[in-house]
Amino acid sequence: MAMNIMIQGTMSNAGKSLLAAGLCRVLKQDGYRVAPFKSQNMALNSFITKDGGEMGRAQVVQAEAAGIEPDTRMNPILLKPTTDVGSQVIVNGQVRGNMQAMEYFRRKRGYIPAVLEAYNSLASEYDVIVIEGAGSPAEINLKQDDIVNMGLAKLVDAPVLLVGDIDRGGVFAQLYGTVALLEEDERRRIKGVVVNKFRGDRAILEPGLKTLEQLCGIPVAGVIPYAHVDIDDEDSLTERFDRSKDRKLLDIAVIRVPRISNFTDFSPFEHYGNVSLRYVDQVSDLHQPDMILLPGTKSTIADLRWLRQSGLEAAILKAADAGTLVFGICGGYQMLGRTVSDPEQVEAAGVTEINGLGLLEMDTEFRGEKVQTQTRGVFCGVEGMLSGLNGLAYEGYEIHMGRSQQQMPALTGSRNVYGSYVHGIFDAPGITDTILKALCARKGVSFDALATFDAYGYKERQYDLLADVVRGGLDMSFVYRVLRREV
């Protein structure tokens, strides 16, 4: 069986996901076959594996860092929020239905066999399993029947590194308070604490670290500096929204619908030096972008109503009429059609049909069975502004409940309005270049002013940079002793 180590945090956004990804990369560089694991993940950003299973993107990032194919065994339970108190429950990559929070809380212990089967299967194939917890292990109201933090650590006998975020302040209270709220057997599982996102001179931190070690009786395993590493992170949505809204040579506006999902679809546009990618949720911020992107959503009908009530629908229609490129992905694509119907009440009770924006000649109907598949092909028959895509290869994945009358498998539309069910459609080489060239031609500017972008090479360099940061801040000799059970 594989060696294992678990990354737990003092809170959400402490940096567990990226630290786990960085550790996966370091171990890969050191010659180990390593796989990530998170028993239960809650996220709207998901991914479809080659065999058609759905999993959280955090473990996809970690798998990529480890140099292996994403596998639903790495995330056997995925919860996709549908309301403030309910989620779609996905087990081993397949939808089990929608549940209210209390119902899931009562039933989650029944998923332990699925969690252990997935974990043991991975552990039989790899040298090391890097496990990520969720939130904090000290959420005393959630400790009963826990299957994602200390409960999981006990099930798979995993040693733990506890991570605290110093960037938001109070890291010593975070770490000490978390340890203090744990049971004695749980405290013994914590082999080291890690201070994450540190800015400044570590020497200033040393007195506090020594006191923390004395108070907790646990060594400090590392201080990870705050690093500007460009890697998709499921907790990074707020940061993306808060980025500078300065407009550059080309201006792309993403409509920030309330239930946005798979926002990482648009990451390729962020890497061009003279392209701004802005998230917009009110008409006054839309201005006159060169391209409008309608993202995926967990609730197409609810977000379509919001789009209408906010005035953004009228603004998008006006922009499209003026020739602005409009592109919808998944739920955003559905919104661009004539109607969206839900006769089986798949999304929510009370609405059976709603008018779309009417920019694409198609209708969408929701059905109970979910489409989840990887897809690839070559663009053909594309007309209008994006005709330059013809002949280019694409690949990605589909996750949707709706069925639409599509003109082509990957892309529907003509003139200046297009839509697709394919998440990741902008990732393949040449696709973003072609779209940006079309925008430049319409605007009368030179594409040479935009730096071309190699998505795969860039991502690999970022994983290596993350590994450098983790290797430099974490005591890896200590980590290896933890893995070998010498601590």
Give the location of each predicted region.
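Flexible phosphate-sensing "switch/lid" loops adjacent to ATP/NTP-binding sites
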Residues: 2-320, 325, 342, 368-369, ...
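A conserved active-site-flanking secondary-structure segment within enzyme catalytic domains
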Residues: 337-392, 396
